[in-house]
């Protein structure tokens, strides 16, 4: 009788559901897929479906035109009263029938859904991209996900939940939340799991206060949304690479049969996998769970995306790169040993694929380790444990080392062994929940999509960096209003990476399919990966991260964990010996940083828990000493002194260097929970502090792989666009000195950063729980309310600088341009200008600048920061305006207004995102002369960036903060502040007729100057309002061959990826060294250009090793 209650309840609910279905049977024929965009025709309410449908049968899609040639405006989703009344009933039915929730969990879900329903109705147009039914399911799925994650043993309103686990898994929830995407014209099918995971951060921004009231302050840490997103993306890349490697090594016994059957039937089955591939994937999952069972409840990616995926999305994240590589290599060894000979594509006698040999024959482990950049000793250490696990799973003895288990994959026992693996995984999965990794091998990867073009909501950088540089091969997002959320360098240099010719990778992008793999001939290519400087195929997500891991293992790991003799000499040459202070600071801060990782999700871990953080700490400290030594040598040459007390005695400088080193190590190992900005709080610094050392770090570490340089680029972009403008940024401490007129506004909003905590106090102030990712858009103090704080007054101040920036600060410009930072090493006339001392970036804001001219160090720092912000804004303004079809002269006006706002209305940027001001500026300039800006009509439906535009808008000039729509911000704040200058820009004839790009008209005056190639430095000079302005945006230079003058050096612009793709096939690209790609491992491309220039100019004999050739020229 105990079980009768739930059964009767389910029967009753099902009976009610059947009656509901009968009453709704008539409406099914009338329900049509909704079009987000439709013609402005008379409409009638469809009561059952809940949204308006045109009376005519014709439908208009995105980009269609009205009969008079105008753009079609987006329709708003409308809820009929009848449909609105049934929201809660349908949600209850879904919970009771579809998921069979118990009563406590059901009540929590109903409460969250009911209290958040007003938010659903208020934001209906920005949720999802399809019908109101899909929007309802999507919102309900997010509600259930939160309840699933937070109700297990949680305290709700003071009452302890009796249930230890919610009775459904994450994959079951995603399957129940079926999203039907109605944009058939675009042939896009959005899967539920992708749509739900992408909507979840925006959902949490809206319902965060409600969730906090129900589950307490720690709800964000327990949800770990970024970890779940990254886990799903990495699982997709993991299986894709596994499938490609499998097909490269082995045949499928039923491949021909299936091809013929599919051809005859006309059915397209792109997700067919053989039973042997299924066995290999399941064996991989089983070995992951059992061999490294201590970490079975943690999720993250590994360094090569081929490492172990710890699949519990709610309990933290961790990565173990070397162990993961070795684990995959070991799995490959097992498949090679046990795969039937008639299914093998390879021969053990192949000297290219199996290059490592001994006196006894082929060294299989060493050959695969060379291919996958794994360490032989690590693989050997795993053999014993893995063999014991396989023996236990199948009940057969298996000796240590390379051993053959009879009957493991033969035809008679394969099916039975596969069922054993399935049962083992099912038992584990039901106990931990999470994503079901079997969905890929079972053919459900087609349902989930490949994350490339499946959803207009998807953006690689969102899951990147979701895992930001996850930034991040670029997926071409289909969006009604494509903004520049993807870092600018990725759009142009997606095929370049160092040291091998690997392209940029966004974890959000779909890996290339096996059919399109350039490794179609494994005999030619497989063995070349292990050699240095060889011709390699284009990159994949795995090969990029493996290259980065190899750099860390081969370049950094062999270094000593102590300062070099030369660096110690610099320490002793200071006013006092600071060697002990430097060592102690490094150990304390790195302990704090990596203890935060350990505290984030290593509870209950034994044995291996201390190995990983200690290894990462050693790598970080070695990298720190290496780069610090290079900086000291550079400063010594510049200052002609060995005494660098002002720099080496600066506490903030050392903390930034240590944090940057730790960030690069964590980025190499792809630790999701410790993604940026997690390193800042343990180090006691702000994001603005870290931005001061990024360019110097890249400049002085010549071996830094391209992918890590891009990672630093992405970090700097994030700092420039939003993080430096947030409350508590140290940028305001310099700004209040450089711009005293802003002191009142800065103090009113309490924007100043707190003093940097002392080293001895950091250990007690930093709590691991606070290091976890926070959902963007939420603050500890909430969205609104008066904020009270004491006014901060600087001890001294200088007069504000003139409009613009000092041209002598070019040296501070970092690689935040439409190109990767590897090109920053190129020599150019602009880089020969005076460079500001490094010490001024970390000196006291009130201290006079070493550059003189009456400036303070605060002036220097702010001028450099504004230069970088203008460069970033210029790229985004041009990108947006070109995509919405605006003319060149209007783009220059937009930039002029933005420049004016930054220098003269700086308070507009406080606590806001720079893209908010970019959008408002573009709209304001286009609105005055009545230019068409139809792209903004659908900004609500682009979701990714547009959603962020609606957050953190300060509407009240007095009082607290308020979040709202960007249109309200534009009308209530932006227009009132910039109206006078907007009118001036439109009426001023000199501004309305911009000069030529290079100032050929001969007009005098200070202008903003941009070199022809975007890889050059951009110097933004100050200019008075109303002065003539040069063309800010130059076109791409002609890349056709030209005669080279022997009087000048050669400066080469990068070949755009689109032209590379047209001119060269993947195989042909391996025969050339493209511009920006070094011919030697971890070597700057500038060294190759030096050898080329020396040869062309014949100035002296150059013995430069260029791709194995020695250039020898006679002196002129």
Curated annotation (Swiss-Prot):
> What Gene3D superfamilies does this protein's entry cite?
1.10.472.140, Cyclin-like (1.10.472.10)
The signal peptide, as residue positions, is none
Question: Where is the segment annotated Spacer?
Answer: 736-859
Q: What is its main location?
A: nucleus
Please list where the region (Disordered) is annotated: 1-27, 42-74, 513-542, 791-812
Region (Domain A) residue ranges read: 540-735
- Per UniProt, what is one Pfam family of this protein? RB_A
What GO terms describe the biological role, i.e. biological process, of this protein? cell differentiation; negative regulation of G1/S transition of mitotic cell cycle; regulation of transcription by RNA polymerase II
**Does the record's keyword annotation contain Kinase?**
no
Q: Where is the composition biased (Basic and acidic residues)?
A: 1-13
Q: Which UniProt keywords apply?
A: Cell cycle, Nucleus, Repressor, Transcription, Transcription regulation
The yes or no answer to whether the keyword Repressor is present is: yes
Low complexity bias locations: 513-522
Please, which domain of life does this record's source organism belong to? Eukaryota
Stretches with biased composition (Polar residues):
793-809
Where would you find this protein in the cell?
A: Nucleus
Q: Where is this region: Pocket?
A: 540-980
* Region: Domain B, residue numbers: 860-980
What InterPro entries would the database entry show? Cyclin-like_sf, RB_A, RB_B, RB_fam, RB_N
Give the protein's function: Regulator of biological processes that recruits a histone deacetylase to control gene transcription. May play a role in the entry into mitosis, negatively regulating the cell proliferation. Formation of stable complexes with geminiviridae replication-associated proteins may create a cellular environment which favors viral DNA replication.
Concerning its family, UniProt says: Belongs to the retinoblastoma protein (RB) family.
What is this protein identified as? Answer: Retinoblastoma-related protein
Q: Which organism is it from?
A: Physcomitrium patens (Spreading-leaved earth moss)
Q: What is the lineage of its organism?
A: Eukaryota, Viridiplantae, Streptophyta, Embryophyta, Bryophyta
């Amino acid at each position: 009788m105990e079980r009768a209650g739930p059964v009767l309840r389910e029967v009753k609910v099902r009976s009610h559901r059947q009656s509901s279905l009968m009453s709704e049977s008539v409406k099914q024929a009338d329900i049509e897929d909704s079009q987000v965009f439709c013609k402005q025709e008379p409409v009638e309410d469809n009561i059952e479906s809940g949204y308006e449908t045109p009376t005519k049968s014709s439908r208009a899609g995105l980009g269609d035109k009205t009969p008079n040639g105008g753009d079609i405006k987006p329709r708003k989703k409308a809820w009929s009263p009848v449909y609105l009344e049934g929201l809660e009933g349908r949600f209850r039915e879904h919970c009771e029938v579809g998921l069979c929730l118990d009563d406590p969990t059901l009540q929590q879900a109903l409460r969250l859904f009911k209290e958040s329903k007003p938010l659903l109705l208020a934001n209906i147009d920005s949720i999802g991209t399809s019908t109101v039914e899909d929007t309802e399911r999507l919102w309900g799925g997010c509600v259930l996900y939160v309840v699933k994650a937070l109700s297990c043993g949680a305290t709700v309103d003071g009452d302890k939940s009796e249930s230890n686990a919610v009775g459904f898994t994450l994959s079951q929830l995603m399957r129940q939340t079926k999203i039907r995407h109605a944009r058939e014209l675009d042939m896009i099918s959005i899967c539920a799991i992708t749509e739900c995971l992408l909507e979840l951060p925006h959902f949490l921004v809206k319902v965060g206060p409600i969730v906090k009231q129900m589950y307490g302050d720690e709800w964000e840490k327990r949800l770990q949304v970024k970890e779940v997103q990254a886990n799903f993306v990495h699982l997709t890349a993991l299986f894709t690479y596994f499938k490609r490697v499998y097909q490269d090594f082995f045949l499928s016994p039923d491949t021909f049969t299936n091809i013929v059957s599919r051809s005859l039937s006309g059915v397209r089955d792109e997700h067919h996998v053989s039973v042997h591939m299924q066995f290999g994937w399941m064996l991989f999952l089983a070995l992951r769970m059992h061999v490294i069972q201590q970490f079975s409840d943690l999720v993250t990616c590994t360094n090569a995306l081929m490492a172990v995926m710890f699949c519990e999305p709610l309990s933290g994240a961790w990565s173990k790169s070397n162990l993961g590589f070795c684990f995959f290599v070991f799995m490959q060894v097992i498949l090679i040993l046990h795969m039937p000979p008639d299914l093998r594509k390879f021969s053990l006698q192949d000297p290219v694929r199996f290059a490592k040999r001994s006196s006894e024959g082929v060294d299989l482990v060493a050959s695969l380790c060379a291919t996958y950049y794994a360490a032989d000793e690590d693989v050997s250490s795993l053999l014993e444990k893995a063999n014991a696990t396989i023996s236990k799973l199948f009940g057969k003895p298996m000796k240590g080392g390379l051993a053959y288990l009879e009957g493991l994959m033969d035809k008679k026992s394969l099916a039975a062994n596969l069922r054993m693996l399935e049962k083992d995984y099912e038992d584990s999965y039901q106990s931990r929940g999470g994503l079901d990794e079997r969905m890929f091998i079972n053919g459900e990867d087609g349902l989930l999509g490949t994350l490339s073009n499946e959803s207009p909501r998807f953006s690689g950088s969102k899951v990147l960096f979701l895992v930001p540089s996850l930034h991040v091969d670029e997926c071409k997002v289909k969006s009604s209003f494509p903004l520049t959320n993807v870092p600018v360098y990725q759009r142009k240099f997606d095929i370049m990476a160092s040291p091998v010719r690997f392209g940029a990778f966004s974890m959000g992008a779909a890996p290339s399919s096996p059919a399109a793999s350039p490794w179609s001939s494994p005999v030619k290519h497989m063995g070349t990966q292990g050699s240095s400087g060889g011709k390699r195929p284009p990159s994949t997500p795995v090969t990029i991260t493996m290259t980065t891991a190899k750099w860390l293992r081969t370049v950094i790991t062999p270094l000593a964990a102590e300062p070099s003799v030369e660096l110690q000499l610099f320490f002793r040459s200071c006013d006092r010996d600071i060697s002990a202070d430097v060592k102690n600071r490094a150990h304390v801060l790195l302990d704090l940083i990596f203890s935060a990782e350990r505290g984030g999700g290593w509870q209950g871990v034994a044995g291996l828990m201390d190995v990983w953080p200690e290894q990462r700490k050693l790598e970080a400290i070695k990298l720190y000493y290496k780069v610090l030594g290079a900086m000291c040598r550079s400063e010594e040459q510049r200052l002609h002194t060995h005494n660098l007390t002002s720099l080496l005695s600066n506490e903030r400088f050392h903390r930034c260097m240590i944090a940057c080193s730790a960030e690069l190590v964590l980025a190499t190992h792809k630790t999701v929970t410790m993604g940026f900005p997690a390193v800042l709080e343990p180090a006691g610094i702000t994001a603005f502090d870290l931005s001061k050392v990024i360019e110097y770090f890249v400049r002085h570490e010549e071996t830094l792989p391209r992918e890590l340089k891009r990672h630093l680029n992405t970090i700097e972009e994030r700092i420039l666009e939003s993080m430096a403008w947030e409350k508590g940024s140290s940028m305001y401490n310099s700004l209040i000195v450089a711009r005293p007129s802003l002191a009142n506004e800065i103090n009113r909003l309490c924007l100043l950063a707190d003093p940097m905590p002392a080293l001895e106090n950091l250990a007690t102030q930093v709590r691991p729980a606070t290091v976890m990712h926070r959902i963007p858009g939420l603050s500890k103090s909430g969205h609104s309310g008066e904020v009270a704080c004491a006014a901060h007054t600087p001890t001294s101040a200088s007069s504000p600088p003139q409009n613009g920036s000092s041209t002598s600060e070019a040296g501070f410009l970092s690689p935040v341009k439409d190109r990767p930072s590897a090109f920053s090493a190129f020599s150019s006339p602009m880089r020969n200008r005076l460079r500001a001392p490094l010490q001024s970036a970390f000196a006291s804001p009130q201290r006079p600048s070493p550059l003189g001219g009456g400036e303070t160090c605060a002036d220097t720092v702010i001028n450099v920061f504004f230069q970088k912000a203008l460069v970033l804004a210029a790229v985004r303004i041009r990108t947006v305006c070109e995509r919405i079809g605006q003319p060149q002269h209007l783009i220059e006006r937009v930039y002029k207004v933005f420049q004016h706002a930054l220098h003269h209305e700086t308070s507009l940027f406080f606590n806001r995102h720079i893209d908010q001001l970019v959008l408002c500026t573009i709209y304001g300039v286009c609105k005055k002369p009545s230019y068409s800006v139809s792209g903004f009509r659908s900004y609500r439906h682009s979701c990714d960036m547009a959603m962020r535009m609606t957050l953190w808008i300060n509407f009240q000039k007095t009082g607290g903060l308020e979040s709202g729509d960007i249109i309200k911000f534009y009308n209530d704040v932006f227009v009132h502040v910039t109206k006078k200058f907007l009118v001036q820009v439109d009426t001023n004839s000199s501004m309305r007729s911009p000069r030529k790009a290079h100032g050929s008209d001969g007009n005098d005056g200070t202008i903003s100057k941009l070199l022809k190639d975007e890889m050059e430095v951009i110097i933004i000079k100050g200019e008075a309002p109303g002065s003539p302005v040069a063309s800010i945006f130059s076109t791409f230079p002609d890349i056709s061959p030209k005669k080279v003058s022997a009087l000048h050096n050669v400066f080469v612009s990068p070949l755009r990826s689109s032209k590379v793709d047209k001119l060269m096939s993947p195989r042909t690209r391996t025969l050339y060294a493209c511009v920006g790609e070094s011919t030697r491992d971890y070597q700057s491309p500038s060294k190759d250009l030096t050898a080329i220039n020396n040869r062309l100019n014949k100035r002296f004999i150059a013995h430069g090793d260029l791709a194995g050739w020695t250039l020898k020229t006679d002196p002129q």
